[in-house]
Regions:
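Glycine-rich phosphate/adenosyl-contacting loop at the front of the ribokinase-like
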Residues: 1-67, 76-80, 332
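Conserved phosphate-binding/catalytic region of the ribokinase-like
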Residues: 4, 8, 210-332
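Structural motif
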Residues: 19-21, 111, 141-142, 237
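Short beta-strand scaffold segments in enzyme catalytic cores
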Residues: 55, 100-104, 246-250
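Conserved N-terminal subdomain of the carbohydrate kinase-like
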Residues: 59-142, 320-332
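Short, small-residue-enriched loops and turns at beta-alpha junctions
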Residues: 119-122, 149-153, 181-184, 201-202, ...
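Short acidic, glycine-rich surface-loop motifs adjacent to enzyme active sites
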Residues: 137-153
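Conserved phosphate/ATP/ADP-binding segment of small-molecule kinases
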Residues: 157-253
Length: 332
């Protein structure tokens, strides 16, 4: 195992103002087969929640650093692909292979062919990743804590410790987590929590069992109550994505709705990550109020569903669409 180091720093972005640091514990190697000539097209990328978020942050022009672990053949390929995209990567070597998936989209639907598990990080690997993240966060405008695909990659309490330690350095901490990981992050205290309506439902935070016939129709008031509870548990602000029903945000005690124009759907996967990343990038770059950032995030999420690439987007299109996002206070 080598000491943690910056694998790539093409333009000195680690010292740039408005930088976003993404904690991405275990990126994936993703292989997607699309329809095309000669039997189809094969697309190979680095992926995973943190990578998709970093990709959108970069698309919106904010400097971004990815803190992550890489191991085995799949990890080496994933890291090389990130470097090829020009990312600033703080890489920790790990003994085990990185997880990977192969998805077939030739019929228009995303069908899993192979999905491998992600082994747990060793104590030493996690310690190195943790220290590297704290170091990089010192000069960052926003620190975004993402989760790995595998449940066993790292202890959920890592998020409590990270949130608390980052808060002690006055870092603006945003998390896009659910379940036990979110519970622990809240204990550490975070500035912004982003969660989906489905995750609130699965976590039992809406007062409706996820298997109940009415589970998909939890009313808005139940979501708002859950948002206030999240705030009481340690969140400064709470943002909830609701697929086609727009975004709800609890900001300074006021609930607002952000509604983007309806778009034709190509692939819904990654829309929530684009929302999260666009909010982080806007706060880092512009230092504006959270309402404006939520409008940009809603636009990024809406445009994401029109594209095949996860976490991809056009800055001009996103900012233009943001002007058409309606943000209003919710009464009651």
């Amino acid at each position: 195992m080598t000491a943690p180091g910056r694998a790539h720093s093409p333009s000195g972005d680690e010292d740039a103002p408005g930088r976003v640091v993404v904690f991405a514990p275990a990126p994936l190697l993703t292989i997607t087969i699309e329809a095309g000539r000669f039997g189809g097209e094969v697309h190979v990328h680095a992926g995973g929640q943190g990578v998709w978020q970093a990709r959108m942050v970069a698309a919106l022009g904010a400097p971004v650093t990815i803190c992550a672990t890489f191991g085995g053949e799949t990890g080496r390929v994933a890291k090389a692909l990130l470097l090829d995209e020009g990312f600033d990567v703080v890489a920790i070597d790990r003994a085990d292979h990185a997880a990977a998936y192969v998805h077939d989209r030739r019929d228009g639907e995303r069908s899993p062919v192979v999905e491998t598990d992600d082994p747990p990080l060793s104590r030493h690997e996690l310690d190195e990743l943790y220290a590297a993240t704290l170091r990089e966060a010192m000069g960052a405008a926003v620190v975004l804590l993402s989760g790995p695909a595998g449940d066993e990659v790292l202890p959920a309490d890592t998020y409590r410790r990270l949130a608390a330690d980052l808060g002690a350095f006055d870092c603006l901490v945003m998390v896009d987590l659910a379940g036990e990981r979110l519970d622990h992050a809240l204990q550490g205290g975070v500035d912004i929590v982003k969660v989906s309506h489905e995750e609130l439902l699965d976590d039992g935070r809406l007062g409706v069992d996820a298997g109940h016939a009415d589970a998909g129709r939890a009313d808005e008031s139940a979501i708002v109550e859950a948002m206030h509870r999240l705030r009481s548990e340690g969140a400064g602000a709470v943002i909830v994505s609701r697929e086609s029903e727009g975004v709800l945000a609890l900001i300074d005690g006021t609930v607002v709705r952000a509604t983007a124009p309806d778009m034709e759907v190509v692939d819904t996967k990654g829309a929530g990550d684009s929302l999260t990343a666009a909010i982080a990038a806007t706060l880092a770059r512009e230092g504006v109020d959270l309402r404006r950032a939520v409008a940009v995030g809603a636009a990024a999420g809406a445009l994401n569903v029109t594209r095949h690439g996860l976490g991809t987007g056009d800055e001009g299109a996103i900012l233009a669409l943001a002007e058409h996002v309606v943000v209003t206070d919710r009464e009651g």
